[in-house]
């Protein structure tokens, strides 16, 4: 079950009809159908009775093991006690055809069920809100990005205003990395397969890799940046005095997601990670992880994600993994020790670590009540072992370093999509592609408006001048709809007095403001990366 604004939902209900055996078509199944089953492709929780009912209905074999029902290679977590929730009000959300394999297809009916009608109505209203603020709609409306048919599926084109947002996010992360002592690097995107075989990606991640042959040699686009950073580490002899060595990169990676799973910027095949890799000694792990956890919490708070809206998880060894039990235990204990010393509560996610090491994940809850997994910190003893990394210790002996993988945004594209939906298209001023729009009341004050435009540009403010023939009220509405944080309205009176009228996106309007006072407050708001419109609040 999922939690939504304090209401417990029986969400994600699915009824799967095997077309191969009974020939049903999607349109033949209506709202009256009550045999709902849980999607076997997700890590969905259901009761033991529900699991048995699901498995009994289906013609395929299954078995219960370690609290999971195994079905056709998929696993569903089973609760020990039957649920007391018996939904009375259902709504069909989607009917589609699903092809899990070439010879099998299903009609999949997605729906939700609630005990009370008002809960169902509340949920449907929430769905409308989610749909309205879909980042794909916002991206098109604000001219941020597109997915033309001529590009490969899952690869976005970022327009001028969308690139501004990306650059601001990267600039902020560059400042964070510099404050933590990172060396920014740049690495290639194509590598010989021998690299991926050494790293283990070829055996454990091949299904998501883009591999191809050129001149009788197998090559691959990088799905992760870590092996490339390892090659930089190996390029010279390292001393214990050099450690920790921290590399950062805005690295473009490619992962071959299934076409049906692609979803705007949230699930793409090519994306930029705010990646970082730290090479260090074992006794440096705890302090480094603690610093990373604290810095991640600080960064997320800049975007308004703090307190109960941040959830920290510890993900342990998955079934498909590399390395010995001893190395996994050491890595997991290092993460646990750091979290405990910080006094941070965390949730253990069994078997959800990376194939090379355990990890700390940060989930955030957005303004629409949804949880998103973002930041990650991973301790890795295995890749240094596989690549035979070394450093010279105090006594002259050669020792194996430990490696920490970290990404705070996760990826620029996904984080940008989450922010667009979280802020509903109205980004904080420092992130907004257009920060100020000047609206002259008439053409008589065009010279004054142009003078203000020049001064704002001199101070690196992203500003536009709207001299269109539309009415002032329409131009104000247009600026508001486009998420412009501030409007400067000027008429004859403002020109004569050398002042401006400032109108905020929050509909606060202040007349007779000295331009220099507004500029000073605006620059301070941008410099501090304030969430709220602090500039106009200071002018009140």
From Swiss-Prot:
Zn(2+) binds at residues 226, 277, 405. It is found in: Cytoplasm. Homodimer. Probably interacts with its editing subunit. InterPro entries: aa-tRNA-synt_IIb (IPR002314), aa-tRNA-synth_II (IPR006195), aa-tRNA-synth_II/BPL/LPL (IPR045864), Anticodon-bd (IPR004154), Anticodon-bd_dom_sf (IPR036621), Thr-tRNA-ligase_IIa (IPR002320), Thr/Ala-tRNA-synth_IIc_edit (IPR018163), ThrRS_anticodon (IPR047246). Its main location: cytoplasm. Binds 1 zinc ion per subunit. GO terms for biological process: threonyl-tRNA aminoacylation. It comes from Sulfurisphaera tokodaii (strain DSM 16993 / JCM 10545 / NBRC 100140 / 7) (Sulfolobus tokodaii). It catalyses: tRNA(Thr) + L-threonine + ATP = L-threonyl-tRNA(Thr) + AMP + diphosphate + H(+). Pfam families: HGTP_anticodon, tRNA-synt_2b. The keyword Transmembrane does not apply. It comes from the Archaea. Residues 134-428 are annotated as: Catalytic. This is Threonine--tRNA ligase catalytic subunit. Its cofactor is Zn(2+). Catalyzes the attachment of threonine to tRNA(Thr) in a two-step reaction: L-threonine is first activated by ATP to form Thr-AMP and then transferred to the acceptor end of tRNA(Thr). Also activates L-serine and transfers it to tRNA(Thr) but cannot deacylate incorrectly charged amino acid; unlike most archaea the editing function is found in a freestanding protein. The gene is thrS-cat. One of its GO terms (molecular function) is ATP binding. The keyword Zinc applies. PROSITE patterns: AA_TRNA_LIGASE_II. Disulfide bonds: none annotated. Its EC number is 6.1.1.3.
């Amino acid at each position: 079950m999922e939690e939504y604004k304090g209401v417990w939902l029986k969400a994600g209900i699915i009824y799967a009809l095997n077309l191969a055996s009974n020939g049903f078509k999607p349109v033949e199944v209506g709202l009256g159908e009550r045999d709902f089953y849980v999607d076997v492709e997700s890590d969905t929780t259901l009761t033991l009775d529900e699991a048995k009912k699901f498995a009994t209905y289906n013609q395929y074999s299954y078995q219960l093991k370690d609290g999971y029902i195994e079905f056709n290679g998929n696993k569903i977590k089973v609760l020990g006690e039957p649920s007391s929730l018996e939904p009375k009000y259902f709504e069909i959300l989607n009917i589609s055809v699903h092809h899990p394999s070439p010879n099998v297809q299903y009609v999949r009916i997605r729906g939700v069920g609630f005990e009370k009608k008002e809960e169902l109505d509340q949920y449907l209203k929430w769905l409308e809100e989610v749909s309205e603020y879909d980042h794909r709609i916002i991206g098109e409306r604000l001219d941020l990005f597109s997915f033309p048919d001529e590009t490969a599926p899952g690869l976005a084109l970022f327009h001028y205003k969308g690139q501004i947002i990306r650059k601001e996010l990267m600039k902020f992360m560059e400042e964070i990395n510099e404050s933590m002592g990172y060396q920014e690097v740049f690495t290639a995107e194509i590598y010989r397969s021998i690299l991926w075989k050494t790293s283990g990606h070829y055996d454990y991640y091949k299904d998501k890799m883009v591999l191809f042959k050129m001149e009788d040699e197998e090559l691959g686009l990088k799905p992760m940046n870590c092996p490339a950073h390892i090659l930089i580490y190996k390029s010279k002899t390292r001393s214990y005095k050099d450690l920790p060595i921290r590399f950062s990169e805005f690295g473009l990676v490619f992962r071959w997601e299934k076409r049906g799973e692609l979803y705007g910027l949230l699930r793409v095949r090519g994306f930029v990670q705010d990646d970082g890799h730290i090479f260090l000694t074992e006794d440096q792990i705890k302090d480094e992880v603690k610093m990373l956890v604290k810095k991640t919490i600080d960064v997320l708070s800049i975007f308004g994600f703090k307190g109960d809206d941040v959830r920290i998880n510890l993900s342990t060894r998955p079934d498909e993994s590399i390395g010995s039990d001893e190395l996994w235990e050491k890595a997991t204990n290092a993460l646990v020790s750091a979290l405990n010393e910080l006094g941070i509560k965390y949730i253990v996610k069994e078997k959800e670590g990376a194939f090379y090491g355990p990890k700390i994940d940060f989930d955030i809850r957005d303004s629409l009540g949804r949880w998103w997994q973002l930041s990650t910190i991973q301790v890795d003893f295995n890749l240094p072992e596989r690549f035979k990394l070394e450093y010279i210790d105090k006594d002259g002996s050669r020792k194996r370093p430990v490696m920490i993988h970290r990404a705070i945004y996760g990826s620029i594209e996904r984080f940008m999509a989450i922010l667009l939906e979280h802020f509903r298209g109205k980004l904080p001023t420092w992130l907004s592609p257009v920060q100020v729009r000047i609206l002259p009341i008439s053409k008589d004050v065009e010279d004054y408006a142009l003078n203000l435009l020049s001064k704002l540009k001199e101070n690196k403010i992203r500003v536009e001048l709207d001299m269109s023939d539309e009415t002032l009220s329409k131009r104000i509405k247009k600026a508001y709809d486009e998420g412009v944080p501030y409007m400067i309205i000027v008429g004859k009176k403002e020109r004569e007095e050398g002042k401006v009228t400032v109108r905020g996106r929050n509909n606060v309007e202040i007349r007779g403001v000295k331009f220099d006072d507004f500029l000073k407050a605006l620059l301070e708001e941008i410099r501090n990366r304030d969430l709220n419109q602090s500039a106009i609040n200071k002018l009140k």
